[in-house]
């Protein structure tokens, strides 16, 4: 993993999660407002360093952490948001204790956004950004099978999903952010890539429609999966900072 980049002045942290894992991460202190960053599938907290940099520069305290079974956080298996939702809850609680007087926001990317949306009870934060989050595990699996193996493979997705209870002890009904997002009371900004083949645009629109107000949707025309910040860096940072400025300060 290595150390936190020198331009980000922070420290190593670890905290317990209801997933059964001890989560490891970096905590960067700020002047006003705090944000928890939640990475995607099969990567680690370093995926969120670009976001951490501009948020820290704007004065926000930032927590980056590894979900269970990712990076430096131990765990037996990745559960695509199920156990990770407990990690999301633990990270929010850790940040509240670390920054008790600050308003708190979340940015969840792909699986990280699913974990944030699936948390039960719903995360009690002041603002939430959900980027390219799948609405349900069926379509998430079908899209990936089609993306990597071709359209004929979509039918294999159901075989994989049928194995969830046996292999992971998870029912497919537990991996439906679309059923949980309405319980999130915080203002929400949904971000979608128009060329995303993992979470298709109509699926992002469905998830947005299921969410409670207040909410916003931003579609990035040229972006595929998880590359919104890279594709539209200046506009992304402007929109995110504006969204948090209104709600965390």
Listing of model-derived features with the role each one plays in the protein:
Residues 1-16:
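An N-terminal hydrophobic leader/cap segment in hydrolases
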Residues 52-74:
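Conserved alpha/beta-hydrolase
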Residues 183-185, 190-192, 196:
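Short beta-strand/loop motif that positions the catalytic acidic residue
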Residues 208-226:
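Catalytic histidine neighborhood in serine/cysteine hydrolases
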Residues 47, 78-99:
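Alpha/beta-hydrolase active-site loop
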Residues 41-54, 67, 202:
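The serine-hydrolase catalytic nucleophile loop
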Residues 223-237:
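Catalytic histidine-centered segment of alpha/beta-hydrolase-like enzymes
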Residues 118-171, 179, 219:
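Hydrolase active-site cap/lid region
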């Amino acid at each position: 993993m290595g150390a936190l980049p020198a331009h980000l002045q922070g420290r190593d942290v670890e905290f317990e999660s209801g997933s059964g894992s001890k989560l490891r991460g970096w905590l960067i202190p700020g002047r006003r407002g705090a944000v928890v960053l939640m990475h995607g599938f099969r990567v680690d907290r370093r995926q969120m360093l670009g976001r951490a940099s501009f948020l820290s520069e704007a004065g926000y305290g930032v927590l980056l952490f590894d979900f269970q079974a990712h990076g430096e956080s131990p765990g037996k298996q990745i559960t695509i948001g199920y156990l990770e939702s407990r990690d999301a809850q633990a990270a929010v609680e850790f940040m509240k204790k670390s920054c008790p007087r600050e308003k708190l926001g979340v940015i969840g990317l792909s699986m990280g956004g699913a974990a944030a949306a699936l948390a039960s009870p719903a995360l009690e934060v002041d603002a939430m950004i959900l980027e390219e989050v799948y609405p349900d595990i069926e379509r998430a699996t079908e899209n990936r099978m089609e993306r990597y193996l071709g359209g004929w493979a979509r039918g294999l997705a159901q075989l994989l999903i049928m194995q969830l209870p046996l292999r992971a002890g998870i029912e497919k009904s537990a991996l439906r952010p679309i059923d949980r997002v309405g319980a999130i009371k915080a203002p929400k900004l949904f971000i979608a890539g128009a060329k995303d083949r993992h979470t298709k645009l109509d699926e992002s629109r469905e998830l947005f429609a299921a969410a409670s107000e207040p909410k916003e949707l931003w579609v990035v025309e040229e972006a595929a999966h998880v590359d919104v910040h890279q594709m539209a860096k200046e506009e992304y940072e402007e929109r995110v900072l504006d969204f948090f400025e209104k709600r965390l300060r």
